[in-house]
Amino acid sequence: MATLKDQLIVNLLKEEQAPQNKITVVGVGAVGMACAISILMKDLADELALVDVMEDKLKGEMMDLQHGSLFLKTPKIVSSKDYCVTANSKLVIITAGARQQEGESRLNLVQRNVNIFKFIIPNIVKYSPHCKLLIVSNPVDILTYVAWKISGFPKNRVIGSGCNLDSARFRYLMGERLGVHALSCHGWVLGEHGDSSVPVWSGVNVAGVSLKSLNPELGTDADKEQWKEVHKQVVDSAYEVIKLKGYTSWAIGLSVADLAESIMKNLRRVHPISTMIKGLYGINEDVFLSVPCILGQNGISDVVKVTLTPEEEARLKKSADTLWGIQKELQF
């Protein structure tokens, strides 16, 4: 007796269902799921895989997303704690790790998360040896270094989400001050994602008009309008959100989907993201920091050389020294 399906559909072709644009998200906490929904809403993948160690939570999140399939254009959403589910991913996004507690610095998390990475990274490499790795877990600059070391991947394929979000926060706050949409407010926050990030005031502009040319004191203590408060708000904002709601999720999820779009569509847009910066700005260690990078299908193909003031360069170097001080003590 022919099944209903056989009566309805005549098959013309035995297909092997290999994904062409698969994305994996490791970690289905608030950040991982914000990344997942943002990626789904942007139609970036033909398959989305989720991995976590908490099996019930993982299955529940997968089912919840699958039930939204009618409203999405990603035909396959899968999950497992077994990394075989991640096979043949183009992009693997790592959000797993210990969460930052209220008042805890991102650097404090480091050894807890290194131990988690020692398990995750080799599994990713085993099943997707040609993928790009996008690290989101904090402290992101150090963990991007850790992922690079453990994976053995070339540095172009190991990317930290870095200051993409810090710069987005900066542009939003700048826009709020000026009454202009963030897209039309340009400014870059570079260096460490977190407390020692560096705002590049010389490049801050609207429509190519440098704000520093109008206010030479911009970003200094002498500035009557105290624009450096904008950068202070960027640094404090995550702590404030964590204090208010327990964690941050939506903005980082959107920021990660923005990076995923540049990679999956080979856009070659410039983003402030964490890359191996050895040889730039007088930095001689294997340190990952955010600088403007051209991002496309091969990951980070080029770095834009930003002209920094001596003070900005010194701050970048100090960040690098801080990070290296922690990195050289790590056990892995």
From Swiss-Prot:
GO terms for biological process: glucose catabolic process to lactate via pyruvate; lactate biosynthetic process from pyruvate; pyruvate catabolic process. Pfam families: Ldh_1_C, Ldh_1_N. CDD domains: LDH_1. It comes from the Eukaryota. There is a cross-link at residue 57 (Glycyl lysine isopeptide (Lys-Gly) (interchain with G-Cter in SUMO2)). Its EC number is 1.1.1.27. The keyword Ubl conjugation applies. Pathway: Fermentation; pyruvate fermentation to lactate; (S)-lactate from pyruvate: step 1/1. This is L-lactate dehydrogenase A chain. It comes from Mus musculus (Mouse).
